[in-house]
Amino acid sequence: MIHSVLIFNNDGLPRLMKFYTKVDIPTQKLLLQQVHSLISTRSAQECSFITPPSLLEDLDDIKVIYRHYATLYFVFIVDDQESELGILDLIQVFVECLDKCFSNVCELDLVFGWQVLQTVLEEIVQGGMVIDTNINRIVAAVDEANSQKNVNSNGSTISASILSSLSRDRGFWGR
């Protein structure tokens, strides 16, 4: 299971912090600081898998897997059921999707286009489980969600891809 996805810059400023397990905010901040301090001192030739920071030391089955792209670190905190190489590939898929959505993504795109960043991640991972890794399908779903937002009765937005999948099912909704 994926417990957390972190994206932060070289200075340790978070650009995305998504937790799939319950973690209080002070612990999230401390975890970000500890992970940044461990990763930022490593060279590009070193392995992309690190031992967990002291905050996670008591958990035997936790792994920290990361990739460094330009000024950003993409970090996944996972349990031992996940493949390290599979997560590295997943990070690559995530970055390639962002690159297609933003036309050569940079840190400012993630700051000002945080909705797209969240949508891309939600198309790939939900509830800590990987649901899709097909770049073309993910980008198409994000494009559809961005171009056709529908407003429900509460005024919140529901993406068209979710609505279309519900209408295709027609099991409950067709009554």
Swiss-Prot record:
Principal place of residence: Golgi
Free-text function comment from the UniProt entry: Part of the AP-3 complex, an adapter-related complex which is not clathrin-associated. The complex is associated with the Golgi region as well as more peripheral structures. It facilitates the budding of vesicles from the Golgi membrane. Involved in vacuolar trafficking and contributes to hyphal growth and pathogenesis.
Pfam families per UniProt: Clat_adaptor_s
Record-annotated membrane-spanning stretches: none
Organism: Candida albicans (strain SC5314 / ATCC MYA-2876) (Yeast)
Keywords on record: Cytoplasmic vesicle, Golgi apparatus, Membrane, Protein transport, Transport, Virulence
Protein name (Swiss-Prot/TrEMBL): Clathrin-associated protein AP-3 complex component APS3
GO biological process assignments: Golgi to vacuole transport; protein targeting to vacuole; vesicle-mediated transport
Subunit structure: Adaptor protein complex 3 (AP-3) is a heterotetramer composed of 2 large adaptins, a medium adaptin and a small adaptin.
InterPro entries with a match to the protein in the record: AP_complex_ssu, AP_mu_sigma_su, Clathrin_sm-chain_CS, Longin-like_dom_sf
Gene Ontology CC annotations of this record: AP-3 adaptor complex; cytoplasmic vesicle membrane; Golgi apparatus; intracellular membrane-bounded organelle
